[in-house]
Amino acid sequence: MERTCYNANLSINDIGRTVTLLGWVSRRRNLGSLLFIDLRDRSGIIQVTVKDDVHIPDVRNEYVIQVKGQVAKKDVPNPKLKTGEIEILASEVVVINEAMTTPLIIDDETDALEDVRLKYRYLDLRRPTMQGKLKTRAKIVRAAHEYLDAHDFIEVETPILTLSTPEGARDYVVPSRIHHGSFYALPQSPQLFKQLLMIGGLERYYQIARCFRDEDLRADRQPDFTQIDIETSFLDEDQILTLMEGLLKKVFKDVIDHDIVLPLRRLKYDEALNRYGSDKPDTRFGLELKDVTSIVSKTSFPLFNSSAYSKAIVIPGIADRTSRKNIDELQLEAKKFRLSSFIVLKVKNNRLEGSAAKFFGDGEADALLQLMSAHNEDLIIIASSNSLSNVCFGLGALRSKYARELGLIKPNTFDLLWVVDFPLFEKDQDSGKFSPLHHPFTRPTPSTADLLASDPGNVHASAYDIVINGYEAGGGSLRIYDQKMQKTIFEILGLSQEDIKNKFGFFIDAFKYGTPPHGGIAFGLDRLTMILSGTDNIRDVIAFPKNLRAACPMTDAPSKIDKSQLDELGIKIIE
């Protein structure tokens, strides 16, 4: 089909040129003697002017048309359009295909509910803002390919149908028709295979990898997602981080023309938790946590005295705007973090006010005001618990909430940092069992590895997360390459020898044949695209995403299957 160029390729320099364009009718305005058509293609919109002496068929919104005509200068330019200085004086308009009235407005400013947008995703994708996000995604992938290829990485595809192994989240499983009663699992990550590639001697691997996790969804999660997955041999942590900073610098420059300053900051996990209440802190604003244990333990409030940890944050200038209802809502939020006590104090006339203020003597009140650098009309929130992480994460959630509500985050800014030196394990407060903070293949730090047998809770991990604007945009670690240490980790996690053999036998066996020191990282492609596109909804940057119920309104997946298929698989559904 004849086409001279895309709309956005035309400019004031093309005046007088005869062109043939293809696209959709975005909007039409009939003024009697003149018909104006906004023609939209993947590059943008251009105005087509049809004079009354040019006879064309009836056209309506979203009709697919071909336009032939001459580029002309517009009498009144439109600065909002890239092609706003020019128009096409049509000599011929051909209707290629008609369209029904669409169930949503095909425009950047649509009023459609998200489920409607997802049901008619093929229409939603016509909106320029959606196409822009997919182009951003493609640019990130292209930049990653160019950088990693230039640094001698080899792109390798790993299996999608694999063995179910405990990696943290629940697996999506696929029944085998040939092996009745047996199931494949879709990979939560290519973790084991990329380590096996290192044992196989490839030394530098990468993949744009599809991953699947059956976990609770939120705005920045999907059940099926994409990673820029990377593994390398014979590099230490500093070398890997330096190499990956180069990749990030190229991505930011190529995609949004933003220069990031290297080297990036490195924040230890303990400092991130204690200062910001998060293992993925957004440091574009203050509201830092302060340790007030030594002050509040001297008050007459009994719950302070029975708690090992107390921290506080100051929210500036909102005391008068904070009602009893607001405080009750904060109390409900605090319950999610199992805090022993949670109090809200207002600063008025250089004194504390609130239901808990009576427990503070003058000395404790003055010490609190001084430590927190609190001023009149500020709000002081204090949380206490015998769990430091509960206190920090609870206040960290409120820190982020108030930063958004008070507009403390500067738009169009990027805050990149590494969080390093994580604990290797986390301990369940109810069962007392250990689970890996990252995954069970993470190497302990050399200085704490000797504690594995005696004090696993104090073993640190050679792990690192890249945090951008408060989002974990990627994470990785040095890997265990010693068979004995890997078995020890599995045993600490409560796996029996039979479990280890059945689920990881092939992996452990590979360690017998000369495993190199190795490590890697995976960047969340969806999350990176979300950040660079300036949206907070991961579904906006995926062509065909699932909704918050892990369903696809367009295809109605997941769905029931025919009984004949179930019989082939040897499966019976019990209602």
Which residues does each predicted region cover?
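Class II aminoacyl-tRNA synthetase catalytic cores and aaRS-like
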Residues: 1-575
